[in-house]
């Protein structure tokens, strides 16, 4: 490919409202252009990167025995009603009606469509297992699209669905998909971790996310410093917290006057007691299909509430903040809430089970209770609702955990029979009995991977593409196209590399050398070959984009040298 004939509209200025490197460089480098909020067009080199990622994903999935299909982008609402998700998914699900008033949705995921495809077509255990996937565009009407391709409304996704006769076989496929995903992300040249995760709106029994490690990631991950344990903080566990200080001694359980003191830090200073020995109360309004209620969550003063864990503990669709006025109407005193004598639902963190000698709210303004004993709460709901923090201990090996940021690029789920049972999708087992399919589902954000790769691989000059997915592997930069010797050598080398199977572009534009090298750095081709003034002395330069190191070599060695570098990567 010749640069002079390729549509690569690079820009000098950063796009408006872009804050992340991937958003800035993908727009400036001529990879994508915005059409509307959260919707982007892929230009030639952006489409090329996308296709390379897609090819690696497809190759590994096909190798694992998966079969590719292509499902409709538009899904009838009836299928979502069958699964029970139509009313639960929220405004992110874009609904519309056709001219005949039939209701449809633009599918953000395709569980319903895939179940509908398989039911009545796969009727016997002899036809199982089956793993079908597609790589198609999806739409999710995000409330706040941002960060370019990382949180758009339209996105290219690989979604796969497996069907099994029993749980054991589903878990076998789940493990195979984890291995396959590791192969995919490894081949893409990414630093990533597979982490335990919450099942979220998809549902199921267990799930893992694949996180590209990057400081710009929206997700926080807890990672053990010694073993392989890693989890999204929404699902992360920890070993029981060790007491950080000596427990206070209280002779009685009684109220104590604490005027204008309600925060844990203020109370800790006042009582000279570590926050660990306080009971923190967090009030939330839980929303369900059938209504709403106020729920009080209690945990140690040194911990923070993990809202996803808390919501899962009570089976809520969503949790929102509750106003002081609403609390007061329910007989609850804001800032001084105790787990005692409450009429509404209470949930206590498992670390408080059996705890004694604590300080908690007094259910009365400006009062706290000292000497609280939670060992009396035998029938209360104790469950893990605390957010894992830096320095907590690994639940598997007991080593210290650290927190880091990640970008979710893949997610696998053990779905079980949630969708098949709801949609009456059954097969006949060995005994001739009808049973719902046991399912797994497996997703990869293909277009998100374009951005995630740059979040992990960039510098202040632009993109640094891994060679496997770079728009071109080698950029031949002819410094002065008016120099016949330079252009002739560049043309000859271009043909040699192209014939050898190297993905190469020849920068033959009638531009000065400065803009050409800046575009090389901005776009991020892994290798550049500078054909310049040194050619008269028989040398050219090879520059590696990652390090920007330049090596001058004899012109007769350049073909062999660059070929070895590309083939070794």
Curated annotation (Swiss-Prot):
Keyword entries, A-Z: Aminoacyl-tRNA synthetase, ATP-binding, Cytoplasm, Ligase, Nucleotide-binding, Protein biosynthesis
Chief place where the protein resides: cytoplasm
Organism domain of life: Bacteria
GO BP terms in the entry: prolyl-tRNA aminoacylation
Reactions catalysed according to its record: tRNA(Pro) + L-proline + ATP = L-prolyl-tRNA(Pro) + AMP + diphosphate
GO molecular-function term, one example from the UniProt record: aminoacyl-tRNA deacylase activity
EC number: 6.1.1.15
InterPro entries registered for this protein in UniProt: aa-tRNA-synt_IIb (IPR002314), aa-tRNA-synth_II (IPR006195), aa-tRNA-synth_II/BPL/LPL (IPR045864), Anticodon-bd (IPR004154), Anticodon-bd_dom_sf (IPR036621), Pro-tRNA-ligase_IIa (IPR002316), Pro-tRNA-synth_IIa_bac-type (IPR004500), Pro-tRNA-Synthase_IIa_type1 (IPR023717)
Function: Catalyzes the attachment of proline to tRNA(Pro) in a two-step reaction: proline is first activated by ATP to form Pro-AMP and then transferred to the acceptor end of tRNA(Pro). As ProRS can inadvertently accommodate and process non-cognate amino acids such as alanine and cysteine, to avoid such errors it has two additional distinct editing activities against alanine. One activity is designated as 'pretransfer' editing and involves the tRNA(Pro)-independent hydrolysis of activated Ala-AMP.
Oligomeric form and interacting partners: Homodimer.
Name listed for the protein in its UniProt record: Proline--tRNA ligase
């Amino acid at each position: 490919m010749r640069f002079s004939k390729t549509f690569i509209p690079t820009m000098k200025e950063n796009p408006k409202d872009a804050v992340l490197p991937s958003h800035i460089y993908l727009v400036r480098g001529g990879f994508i252009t915005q059409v509307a909020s959260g919707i982007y067009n892929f230009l030639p080199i952006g489409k090329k990167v996308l296709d390379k990622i897609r090819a690696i994903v497809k190759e590994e999935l096909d190798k694992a025995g998966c079969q590719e299909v292509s499902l409709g982008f538009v899904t009838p609402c009836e299928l979502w009603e069958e699964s029970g998700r139509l009313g639960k998914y929220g405004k992110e699900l874009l609904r519309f009606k056709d001219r005949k008033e039939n209701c449809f949705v633009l599918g953000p995921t395709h569980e319903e469509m895939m179940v509908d495809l398989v039911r009545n077509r796969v009727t016997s255990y002899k036809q199982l297992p089956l793993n079908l996937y597609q790589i198609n565009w999806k739409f999710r009407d995000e409330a706040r699209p941002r960060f370019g391709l990382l949180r758009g409304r339209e996105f290219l996704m690989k979604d796969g669905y497996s069907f099994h006769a029993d749980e054991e076989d589903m878990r076998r496929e789940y493990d195979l998909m984890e291995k396959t995903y590791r192969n995919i992300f490894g081949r893409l040249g990414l630093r990533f971790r597979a982490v335990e995760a919450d099942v979220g709106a998809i549902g199921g029994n267990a799930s893992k996310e694949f996180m590209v490690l990057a400081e710009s990631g929206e997700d926080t991950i807890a990672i053990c410093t010694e073993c392989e344990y890693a989890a999204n903080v929404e699902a992360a566990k920890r070993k029981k917290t060790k007491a950080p200080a000596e427990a206070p001694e209280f002779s009685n359980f009684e109220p104590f006057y604490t005027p204008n003191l309600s925060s844990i830090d203020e109370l800790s200073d006042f009582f000279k007691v570590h926050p660990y020995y306080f009971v923190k109360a967090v009030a939330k309004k839980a929303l369900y299909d059938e209504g709403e209620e106020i729920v009080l969550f209690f945990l140690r003063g040194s911990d923070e509430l993990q809202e996803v864990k808390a919501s899962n503990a009570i089976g809520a669709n969503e949790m929102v903040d509750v106003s002081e006025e609403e609390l007061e109407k329910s007989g609850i005193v804001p800032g001084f809430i105790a787990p005692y004598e409450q009429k509404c639902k209470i949930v206590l963190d498992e670390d408080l089970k059996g705890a004694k000698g604590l300080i908690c709210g007094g259910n009365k303004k400006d009062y706290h209770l000292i000497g609280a004993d939670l060992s009396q709460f035998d029938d209360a709901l104790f469950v893990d609702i605390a957010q894992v923090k830096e320095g907590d201990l690994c639940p598997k090996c007991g080593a210290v955990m650290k927190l880091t940021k990640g970008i979710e690029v893949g997610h696998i789920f053990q779905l079980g029979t949630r969708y098949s049972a709801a949609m009456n999708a059954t097969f006949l087992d060995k005994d001739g009995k009808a049973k719902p399919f046991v399912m797994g589902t497996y997703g990869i954000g293909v277009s998100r991977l374009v951005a995630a790769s740059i979040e992990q691989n960039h510098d202040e000059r632009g993109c640094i593409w891994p060679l496997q997915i770079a728009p071109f592997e080698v950029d031949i930069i002819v410094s002065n196209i008016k120099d016949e010797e330079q252009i002739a050598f560049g043309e000859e080398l271009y043909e040699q590399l192209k014939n050898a199977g190297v993905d190469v572009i020849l920068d033959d534009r009638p531009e000065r050398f400065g803009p050409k090298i800046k575009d090389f750095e901005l776009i991020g081709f892994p290798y550049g070959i500078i054909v310049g003034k040194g050619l008269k002395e028989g040398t050219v330069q090879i520059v590696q984009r990652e390090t920007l190191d330049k090596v001058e070599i004899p012109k007769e060695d350049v073909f062999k040298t660059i070929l070895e570098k590309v083939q070794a990567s």
